[in-house]
UniProtKB/Swiss-Prot annotation:
This is Basic blue protein. Induction: Down-regulated by microRNA 408 (miR408) via AGO1 and AGO2 in response to low copper availability. Residues 34-129 form the Phytocyanin domain. It comes from the Eukaryota. The keyword Metal-binding applies. GO terms for molecular function: electron transfer activity; metal ion binding. Expressed in the inflorescence and in the transmitting tract of the pistil. Detected in roots, stems, cauline leaves, cotyledons, hypocotyls, guard cells, pistils, sepals, stamen filaments and vascular bundles of roots but not of leaves. Not expressed in petals, anthers or pollen. It comes from Arabidopsis thaliana.
């Protein structure tokens, strides 16, 4: 009989532990990636450089660039290319007009490399934590 009671006691503890873990999992806040449409008007265009101000980005968040592909594009670049408005060799422009780009941890730099567009502040720098 003692053996039976020990098994029941162990089973009861296992159930209580399982229930506690379940409650914790249900209450946990799961961090999900956020999606941001670039540009105050929802369009990737000139004078976008200030758009990221006041926003908090995380690695895995997605930036959506909406634009007319006959007039603009998006190129992910490094800080030097961003500051100089130069497209590095081998950089692949996004050209769909509805590009979705996932942020990596750290600094992320984007420009339009159509002539004189980056120089007209069609560029953004985003830091993702």
């Amino acid at each position: 009989m003692a053996k039976g009671r020990g098994s029941a006691s162990w089973s009861a503890r296992a159930i209580v532990t399982l229930m506690a873990v379940s409650v914790l999992l249900l209450q946990a806040d799961y961090v999900q990636a956020a999606t941001y449409t670039v540009g105050d008007s929802g369009i990737w265009t000139f004078n976008a450089v200030g758009w990221p101000k006041g926003k908090h980005f995380r690695a895995g968040d997605v930036l959506v660039f909406n634009y007319n592909p006959r007039m603009h594009n998006v190129v992910k670049v490094d800080s030097g290319s961003y500051n100089n408005c130069k497209t590095p060799t081998g950089a692949k422009p996004y050209t769909s007009g509805k590009d979705r780009i996932t942020l990596s941890k750290g600094q992320n730099f984007f420009i339009c490399n159509f002539p004189n567009h980056c120089e007209s502040d069609m560029k953004i720098a985003v830091t993702a934590v």
